[in-house]
Every structure is written in C-alpha cells, then in structure tokens.
Amino acid sequence: KKYVFIIDEINRANLSKVFGEVMMLMEHDKRGENWSVPLTYSENDEERFYVPENVYIIGLMNTADRSLAVVDYALRRRFSFIDIEPGFDTPQFRNFLLNKKAEPSFVESLCQKMNKLNQEISKEATILGKGFRIGHSYFCSGLEDGTSPDTQWLKEIVMTDIAPLLEEYFFDDPYKQQIWADKLLGDS
C-alpha cells in the first residue's frame, strides 16, 4: 500500500531545522530500515526512525509569496519540482463549471478573460511574472449549495478576491487595476 504525506506551504519554515537528519532519509535511495537513524530524545536506545519506501512526500509552495525564504539547496535536491499552471485551458475546469450549470458562452468568456489577464501579469516581469498568474481555484468554490456560475457569482469573486489581488499586483497603476476588474465583469 502507498502512502502520501503532503506538506502545504513547505517554504514557510526553516526546513533544515524542521527536518534535521530526516532530510537525508527523504531521498529515494535512502529509504527503508537499512537507513534508519536513532531517535534523539528516545528513552530506548534501540528505537530508530526511517522513511518507508512506500511513503511519498509532496511539498506544496506558493512561489509568488515574496515574504518567504527560498527553499535551500539541501532540500531542493531531494524533491522534483513541478509547476502547476492555471487551469483555464483545461477540459477539467471547463467541465467543472458546465457540470455546475454554467452556460457554455459564460465559461468560454471567463476563460478567455482570465487567460488575457494572466498574459498581462506574466509580461510584468520586473515586479510580477509567471509565478503571479491567477489560478482557477478562485472559481471552484461558492458552488457547493447548488449555486450556478453566473454574472452575480463572478462579480462576487472579482470584487472580493481578484480586484484586491490586482490592487496589490498593480499598486502603482490604479487605472490598470480598474481596467482589468471592469474587463472581467464586462461583456467584452
């Protein structure tokens, strides 16, 4: 049986201090009892710790958060890194909204607008860039009670989530903030 250990926001801590000697045991070729280490605070000298071969460690991190330290190289080499792109072009996201009773034209318009906004964010390489693009997860909640994705639902997301984010992103250009909020809410 396989097990997954997920660490969200893995870059929020000093990972060398959190993991200590266990960091070595995370490597795929250092798994199992042969690589076990004694437990520092154990009363029993025979107690040892190892990471089993059937445990997969997944660390999630938000690279757009500037207040966080970069992951140190000692940890970085123990993980494979995969970028997760915004999913506006995926059939899964579009089908999710369609299954929630969104109109196909509404879904198409939303995806086009968000892709254009993300292109704009990516072009702002000096202060923003690719890592700051807005993901599809903003549009996956608020539908649990049977609400259908429509213009009122979109307005709420834009006004409470996206517009404040744009204020941060384009802090030096209030005009650009407003233009993009209007574009997301408009018919064009």
Regions found by a protein language model. Give the residues of each.
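C-terminal regulatory/interaction module of P-loop NTP-utilizing enzymes
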Residues: K1-S188
